[in-house]
């Protein structure tokens, strides 16, 4: 008797601020068409300003041979605060390292926030997962403009926050949350299912020299670009942490959707600090259940490191 495994394709929207690690995450999603149906990509200001994140998303789509995908520019600033960027990590373009051509794809005329609202409204409730790789501004503004859409999303899976690993942009805060803490708070206060892939996980996903060599061994343009991008962005974290390897953040979101068994965590209460000057953007995760506050998010705390990199390498080699 021959058995068949039925793979249910997940509809996703990628909300992103590319960023080298965002680029790898997008490539991982595009290398997994049997499991993931990318309905569109919305960009947000974060690692670099909006004009560059919108350009970079199109560059990556073309690199993957997926120029039919639609990229929509969202918010160019946080909801209530001036924009903080991370060119010191990602370079002036956000994708520093390799020499990349100008994209031929056109940026869509429709605003990314309107695309989010209209797409969620037009699809069956509970059928779309929002994959957030950057500051959460676009999603929060969409919720503010059309509160009913949040009941239509299946889940928000986000690379955001930290608890045991504290912060990477300040002593207390992870970058994506720190850039727009009010946006993160709006999402936490919503009824949608939420999963955090925090620094507690991504700081375990260290790109070693051997992993860089594995990307190069593909013998493809994609493999070479990934190698050159990560070697550029890694230099900052290697110096900061005194390590010979650096964390790979955003691909954890896509890997979680592809193979959730690689990850483990707890359903706990998570709150975002929005008032303190000292701890602004801090992700307060009640890991030990001592606050008495109601649990509101799935907070991932551990990952099968070997399994993650095996999945990443296998999929990216197909591009």
Give residue ranges: language-model regions:
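A residue-level signal for conserved active-site and pocket-lining positions in enzyme catalytic cores
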Residues: 71, 187, 254
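Short, Lys/Arg-enriched N-terminal segments with co-localized hydrophobic residues
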Residues: 1-7
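Generic secondary-structure signature for well-ordered alpha-helical cores
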Residues: 34, 62-67, 76, 121-122, ...
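Acidic/polar N-terminal loop/beta-strand segments that form early-domain functional surfaces
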Residues: 43-46, 74-76, 275
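Active-site histidine-anchored catalytic micro-motif
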Residues: 9-16, 20-59, 93, 100-203, ...
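Metal-dependent C-N hydrolase catalytic cores
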Residues: 10, 52-123, 295-303, 313-317
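Short, mixed-charge aromatic SLiMs
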Residues: 48-52, 56, 80, 162-166, ...
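Conformational coupling and interaction surfaces
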Residues: 8-9, 28-31, 35-38, 178, ...
